[in-house]
């Protein structure tokens, strides 16, 4: 919070105050020292002029009586998206060494009247014009429905922290195709943008530290481990986690269904991201890529994104009937936005889709599986949001096979039917920043599951993420915020937020920027059923850190079958140029496979070398999978007992778990095929439990 300079009544202090005022006028921002002996949360040298924080009281520190940290989690934010998309999609900066007036200014093409703001027009943020002036008047932006203007000015992030937020996931984000369609001042290469956004996040940490007396002293702390995050939160500061949400990670786009990256590119890319401090990421976003298919957007947005997919990859989305209760978003038949439709080649139009075909045909590719395994090896957390249900289901199968807890859903883009599988693994979930009523309603849908698994809850603001935010409810609404109000812990008083000449009120302005998150949480509390939701949100930080710590501590189970002798009832032999030996199921290479002859009663078995304890068998099926099969064990290779069976096999990854038993031989016994082919397995893994 900005505080006036004061050091007694002497003429020297008055002269210094006059000098600082003149410096602010003539040279822009000048630091304003805090009073001697000020509280740790007050900056010792804040720029002036600057935004106010409008929160008084000490940020809570330490832990609760059970030794757990408290605080909210913003599981999905984009602090630096103004640096992505070619640098001109999101106008205004999170910070500037030249001060607030330089940070909170519009893009050059928006002047003088907003008529050149192409992206703002496309997304409905204005009626063809807007006042481009940010600081100090902010007549038209930021606003809850303006998708092209900065919402994450550092002081607004500071206000969210002062209101009780203790974890912020900063997803580094961009999209090369969108960049190519908009005004830009830099490269559209996605990895170049990701590197820049990471660097700018570290520069923001340095910028905040400079206000507090030097390195490590500010409230904005980038963390790379769960233990670091816990220490930061116990100090009462904000733990900032780096994530990645981009359409072509490591250059892994697909063109006409041909991957444009290799396993080597993935290894190099994951190593680089980990070195930058990234600990969570999406494998695909908006466009189908070489790693996975996406969950569709709906309505007009869906049509526009589908056109973007075609322009980027040469393919439109392809749909099929869903295999289970989970489904992707319906694409719909909305008219294509003219500005996008005119980009299509002559004679090409957006295809129509059957109303009962709601699932993306594309799932998790072999390269996607390789990338996911690479994330597991590096202790990184996977974001399921934006994955098609086919891809998400396959990813969950793989994570369950590894008993890997590092799985997240950060902003309501995962089918809710996956929630229990996520919690069973030990993952963390958050909902998008809907209206207070919408957020409470969505939270209620899985409240019993959170109670069952003893987990907290989070929100994903998606600020600067082109999503739209809660609008005004009016001062007379039943859940209208009464200013000033107290933070959830009772330790701070929060008043209307003031930046320059503009005062924001959530009731009349909606959630225009990140600084209004505490106000939105207060509105949730005032909504019917909202107090219990706020209570769950206050446990979000602990739950997020628990997921992260378990991810770091995960130890892969020993595959008892790796490299052991394998045999089979039959092997497909009639193609002399391809090897389908049963030994290929235990070679650790998902690019090779065993294939049987084309009949039902077939088996594959592995000799573990000696009697071992066995409690889990994982199968990676090729398209020729078993509808019905059983897992059998034996000590001598002649006398077998069935320990697990199914008659509803659906291919992909299968994990059979059963009470741990002694066995030397493990057999997969096919009873009924799901296809006209035989049975085919890429890999078989056997574990103790």
Identify the meaning behind each predicted range:
Residues 612-623, 668:
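A short beta-strand element within beta-rich, extracytoplasmic domains
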Residues 2-35:
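Secretory targeting and sorting signals
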């Amino acid at each position: 919070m900005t505080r006036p300079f004061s050091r007694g009544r002497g003429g020297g202090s008055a002269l210094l105050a006059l000098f600082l005022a003149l410096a602010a006028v003539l040279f822009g921002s000048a630091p304003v020292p805090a009073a001697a002996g000020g509280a740790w949360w007050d900056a010792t040298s804040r720029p002036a002029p600057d935004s106010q924080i409008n929160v008084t009281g000490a940020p809570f520190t330490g832990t609760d009586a059970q030794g757990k940290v408290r605080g909210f989690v913003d599981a999905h934010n984009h602090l630096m998206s103004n640096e992505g998309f070619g640098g001109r999609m999101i106008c205004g900066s999170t910070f500037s060494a030249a001060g607030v007036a330089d940070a909170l200014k519009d893009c050059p093409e928006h002047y003088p009247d907003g008529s050149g703001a192409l992206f703002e027009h496309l997304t409905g943020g204005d009626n063809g014009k807007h006042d481009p002036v940010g600081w100090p008047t902010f007549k038209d932006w930021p606003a809850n429905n303006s998708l092209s203007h900065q919402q994450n000015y550092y002081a607004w992030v500071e206000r969210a922290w002062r209101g009780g937020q203790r974890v912020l996931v900063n997803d580094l984000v961009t999209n090369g195709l969108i960049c190519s369609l908009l005004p830009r001042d830099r490269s559209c290469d996605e990895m170049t943008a990701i590197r820049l956004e990471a660097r700018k996040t570290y520069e923001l940490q340095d910028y905040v530290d400079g206000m507090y007396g030097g390195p490590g002293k500010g409230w904005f702390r980038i963390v790379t481990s769960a233990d670091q995050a816990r220490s930061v939160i116990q100090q009462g500061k904000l733990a900032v986690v780096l994530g990645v949400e981009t359409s072509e990670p490591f250059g892994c786009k697909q063109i006409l269904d041909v991957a444009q990256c290799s396993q080597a590119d993935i290894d190099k890319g994951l190593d680089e991201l980990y070195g930058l401090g990234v600990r969570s990421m999406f494998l695909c976003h908006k466009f189908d890529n070489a790693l996975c298919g996406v969950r569709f957007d709906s309505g007009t947005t869906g049509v526009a994104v589908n056109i973007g997919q075609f322009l980027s990859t040469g393919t439109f989305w392809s749909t099929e009937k869903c295999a289970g209760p989970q489904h992707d978003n319906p694409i719909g038949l909305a008219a294509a936005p003219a500005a996008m439709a005119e980009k299509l080649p002559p004679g090409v139009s957006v295809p129509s889709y059957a109303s009962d075909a709601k699932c993306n045909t594309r799932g998790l590719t072999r390269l996607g599986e390789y990338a996911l395994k690479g994330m597991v090896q590096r202790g990184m957390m996977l974001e399921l949001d934006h994955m098609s249900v086919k891809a998400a289901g396959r990813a969950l199968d793989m994570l369950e096979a590894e008993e890997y807890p590092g799985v997240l859903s950060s902003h309501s883009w995962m089918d809710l039917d996956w929630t229990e599988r996520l919690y069973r693994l030990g993952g963390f979930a958050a909902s998008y920043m809907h209206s207070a009523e919408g957020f409470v309603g969505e939270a209620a849908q899985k409240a019993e599951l959170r109670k069952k698994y003893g987990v907290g809850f989070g929100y994903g603001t998606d600020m600067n993420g082109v999503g739209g935010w809660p609008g005004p409810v009016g001062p007379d609404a039943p859940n209208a915020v009464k200013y000033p109000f107290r933070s959830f812990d009772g330790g701070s008083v929060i008043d209307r937020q003031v930046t320059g000449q503009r005062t924001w009120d959530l009731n009349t302005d909606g959630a225009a920027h990140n600084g209004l998150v505490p106000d939105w949480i207060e509105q949730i509390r005032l909504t019917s059923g909202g107090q219990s939701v706020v209570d769950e949100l206050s446990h979000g930080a602990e739950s997020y850190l628990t997921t992260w710590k378990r991810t770091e501590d995960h130890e892969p189970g020993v595959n008892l079958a790796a490299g052991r002798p394998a045999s089979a009832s039959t092997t497909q032999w009639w193609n002399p140029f391809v090897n389908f030996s049963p030994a290929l199921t235990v070679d650790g290479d998902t690019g090779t496979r065993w294939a049987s002859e084309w009949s039902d009663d077939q088996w594959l078995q592995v000799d573990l070398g000696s009697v071992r304890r066995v409690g889990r068998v994982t199968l990676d099926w090729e398209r020729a999978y078993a509808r019905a099969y059983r897992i059998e064990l034996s000590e001598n290779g002649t006398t077998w007992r069935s320990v697990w069976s199914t008659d509803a096999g659906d291919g992909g990854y299968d994990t059979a778990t059963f009470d741990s038993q002694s066995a030397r031989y493990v057999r997969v016994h096919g009873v009924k095929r799901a296809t006209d082919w035989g049975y085919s397995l890429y890999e078989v893994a056997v574990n103790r439990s």
